[in-house]
Amino acid sequence: MIRVRGIHSTAIAGLLDEAGFRFADLSQELLARIPQLRVEERVLVTVKDTDDRSGVVVLGDRAVVEKVAYLLRAVIPGALVSYVGEGPYTTYAVRLLSRVEGDVYEAEYSPGKRTTVKLRRPHVEGEVIMAHVIRASPEAPLLKEGVAITGSLVRLVQFDRHSVSEHIRDENLRLQLLTLAMTSAPTGWGVHFRSASKRASIVDVMAEIKALSEKAEKILKEVAPKEPGVVVPGEAIAIVEIPADASIRMDALRSRYYPTLPLHHLLKRLGDDELSRAVDFSERLLAGCEKCLSSTGAIEVFLERLSSLKGRQVSVLHRKVAGAGHVWSAEVESVKRMTVVLKRVVSSPGLYDGFEGLKREPGDVIRSYTWLFGRAVVHFYTSARGELKGVYVNINAPVFFAGNANTLGYVDLGVDVTRAADEEPKVVDLAEFLDLVERGVLDKQLAGSYLEFAESVKHLLEKDIGEDLPARIMQAQKSIFSFETDKLLAV
């Protein structure tokens, strides 16, 4: 039923096994770690790492995805869950509004909601057509013209090419399946063979192609939507962000099923294959001696990696909960134990976010202070002459390495605290933060701690805003939050 992949697979498989779930397409390594896992043939849901290993993506059958995602949030305090029921390959009726560029149009996909859709044929503004989701989002999914129909073995996609799942690696079988698609697919439709096809008989695969083809023909003949909305359900998707504080809870969970080094998942996030193999080897030696090592060694690894960044350009991944966001680059000006100072020089004019009319001018310098496991990034905006223009404090889930040791990352929680040089401090963007709480993305108790933290930062900004401000904000974090990562700030 559930396929599990990635650095979180042992912890998640053990948890889901206790909850009564069954598994499919398991690796031999995972079965060796947890031999009691119950296995069946069909894959309904896949759980895999996000690109930077800071969480997991849960994708597949709607009912199962929802159960898995919210079980993870219930068991792992600090995890952030963004659930989209109408995920990949959901087919919508959309009303074309205006052309954006080339064959890309702005369209209404649900009453009052807009997104962009890529067309495959000429159409006119105001026309209602059918299109399917190719990139899910709770706000504005990216759509592509054509109907998509998903079965357990194959998927039919209008105007698409035939394809085979990357999990089917047998070249002879791939060729056999593609040949089958060319002889049995309806005209104008592409067949995608899902991973379950490799364990099914050709007769069963042919039968499902036929059944979906008949469904496709019926939809094209009988469905003539006049208004935007869902036409054919697709897969659901949940993005479960596991910030550094929640990652330590994952370590504790994993240790119930297999010997686990302290800070195991944070070490794995560094993307260092040699270090990853060393972690695996050490854990094999730890059987029967789970308390042999402390977290001190892992912390020293993190500090060593952070220190090595001094004087270099690094990327900072500013993520939103649903996976969107942006990347900014900066020079690492200094590193002192856990704290890092990042420097950028402004090259183009504009206005600073979070302020009313505060000008951003070429030559301005932005110094950003943060620290490993920091729940804030403190930005000082100064003119080319060194005059302070303002301070912007971004409140976020804990900062950590993102996918490799040259990239830092955090999840933006929406709420920020600002103070222009001659004004009083204020909390901004609170509506975005409260929306996360309302949607169930952020646990209410944890949300309360973040609001207290924001108010504490605001209070600190009412006082002197000198270079010791980041250190005082770090102390506020330690006094408000009680996760293991917050305790590590004393290291």
Swiss-Prot record:
UniProt KW keywords: Endonuclease, Hydrolase, Nuclease, RNA-binding, rRNA processing
Disulfide partners: none
Entry's EC annotation: 3.1.26.-
Keyword Nuclease: yes
Gene behind the chain: fau-1
Function recorded in the entry: Probable RNase involved in rRNA stability through maturation and/or degradation of precursor rRNAs. Binds to RNA in loop regions with AU-rich sequences.
Record-given protein name: Probable ribonuclease FAU-1
Family in the record: Belongs to the FAU-1 family.
PANTHER family found in the cross-reference section: PTHR39159, UPF0374 PROTEIN YGAC (PTHR39159:SF1)
GO BP terms, alphabetized: rRNA processing
